[in-house]
């Protein structure tokens, strides 16, 4: 699928980071004979409790969790599949690393979506703030437990590098960063091996796969639940100064998907037509964007359709955020997160961190950081249940807060 130039680039980059294929803690569990070491990292992430909890974090805000829709877990599985295909077509030796990074890329996301991240960052500024990608790194390196002999999952450094989208500390970039301890850890490991790359080929692939899955599959869910129509998203492109260059392409995709849906032999009803239309849309978007990957400004990118990919993500997000239900959902989420933070941060009420799980109490860190760890790992529904436990039954369902 890809030209020789980008394949050669990918192989060169993989060769550079092959120096990072080692674990910091040497430990032989006697159960991994004849297993590829990087494949073990995939299993460790897949079977982690943090990954399982993604099933309770909605990919699209305001969607009832009981409905048949995507959540952060199913989204991560879809990102992993796309990443595997890209890595395979780029002829990487170890495609599983990009796949593992894709499984883990949302593992640090808090309840109640992006706005939950904003609220938690505001509450935890005293101990270095909060950022979803930084939290993912902390979870894998410190919080998750695999064995008593070491903290975290003891993943290969190459795998940890693969989930690092932004290699900055908070002083270098206060929007996208790693926590200071994790930044220093990774910097030390890279320096010790003479690796100067700050974003690995695995991370590049994961990042593109995430954007492609977001563009295609979130659109499908938004259409399925009536949050937006196909005409509306096409119109958003037409009126956007930043993304209007992609309007002709988006129009062509919409028309072609409609033509295919009209011709489908099973489309005897409008409901069947809508199903075929959505599936054709997602397939076309994924195929167009995956096929468009090449070498752009010295790294992986889209040769022609960057505005389409970014526009689908940002314009959909913008359109959905205008909905009243989404505004209420975010406001409710903020109240729950702030309430729980107040409870767990109370030195008298939560003396010796007894309200936190035992595995967090055992970590020697500031109270604010541990409270942030706990809340950020909660599923949306569990956070609401915990809030009601402390503030009274039905309190989480209030829709107006001062």
From Swiss-Prot:
Entry keyword annotation includes Transmembrane: no
Domain of life from the UniProt record: Bacteria
Output the CDD domains linked to this UniProt entry: HDc (cd00077)
Q: Which residues form the HD domain?
A: 72-215
GO MF annotations in UniProt:
dGTPase activity
The alphabetized UniProt keywords are:
Hydrolase
Gene Ontology process terms (BP): dGTP catabolic process
Q: Which family does it belong to?
A: Belongs to the dGTPase family. Type 2 subfamily.
NCBIfam families, per database record:
dGTP_triPase
Q: What is the protein name given in its UniProt record?
A: Deoxyguanosinetriphosphate triphosphohydrolase-like protein 2
Lineage, uppermost ranks: Bacteria, Pseudomonadati, Pseudomonadota, Gammaproteobacteria, Vibrionales
């Amino acid at each position: 699928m890809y030209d020789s130039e980008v394949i050669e680039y990918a192989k060169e980059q993989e060769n550079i980071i092959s120096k990072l294929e080692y674990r910091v803690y040497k430990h032989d569990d006697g159960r991994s004979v004849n297993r590829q070491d990087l494949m073990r990292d995939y299993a460790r992430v897949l079977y982690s409790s943090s990954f399982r909890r993604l099933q309770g974090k909605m990919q699209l805000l305001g969607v009832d969790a009981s409905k048949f829709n995507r959540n952060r877990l199913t989204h991560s599985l879809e990102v992993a599949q796309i990443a595997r295909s890209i890595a395979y077509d780029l002829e990487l030796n170890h495609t599983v690393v990009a796949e593992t990074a894709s499984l883990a890329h949302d593992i640090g996301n808090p309840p109640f979506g992006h706005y939950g991240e904003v609220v938690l960052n505001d509450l935890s500024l005293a101990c270095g703030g909060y950022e979803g990608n930084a939290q993912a790194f902390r979870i894998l390196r410190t919080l998750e437990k695999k064995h008593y002999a070491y903290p975290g999952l003891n993943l290969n450094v190459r795998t940890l590098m693969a989930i690092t989208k932004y290699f900055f500390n908070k002083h270098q970039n206060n929007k996208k960063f790693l926590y200071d301890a994790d930044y220093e850890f990774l910097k030390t490991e890279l320096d010790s091996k003479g690796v100067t790359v700050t974003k690995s080929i695995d991370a590049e692939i994961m990042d593109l796969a995430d954007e492609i899955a977001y563009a295609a599959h979130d659109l499908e869910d938004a259409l399925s639940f009536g949050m937006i129509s196909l005409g509306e998203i096409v119109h958003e492109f037409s009126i956007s100064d930043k993304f209007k260059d992609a309007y002709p392409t988006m129009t062509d995709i919409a028309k072609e998907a409609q033509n295919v849906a009209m011709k489908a032999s099973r489309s005897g009803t409008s409901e069947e037509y809508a199903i075929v239309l959505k599936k054709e849309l997602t397939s076309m978007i994924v195929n167009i964007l995956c096929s468009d990957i090449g070498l752009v400004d010295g790294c992986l990118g889209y040769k022609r359709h960057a505005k389409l990919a970014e526009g689908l993500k940002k314009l959909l997000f913008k359109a959905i955020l205008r909905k009243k239900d989404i505004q209420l959902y975010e406001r409710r989420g903020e109240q729950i997160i702030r309430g729980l933070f107040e409870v767990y941060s109370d030195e008298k009420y939560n003396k010796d961190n007894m309200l936190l799980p035992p595995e967090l109490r055992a970590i020697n860190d500031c109270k604010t950081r541990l409270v942030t760890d706990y809340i950020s790992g909660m599923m949306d529904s569990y956070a609401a249940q915990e809030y009601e436990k402390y503030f009274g039954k039905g309190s989480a369902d209030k829709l107006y807060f001062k």
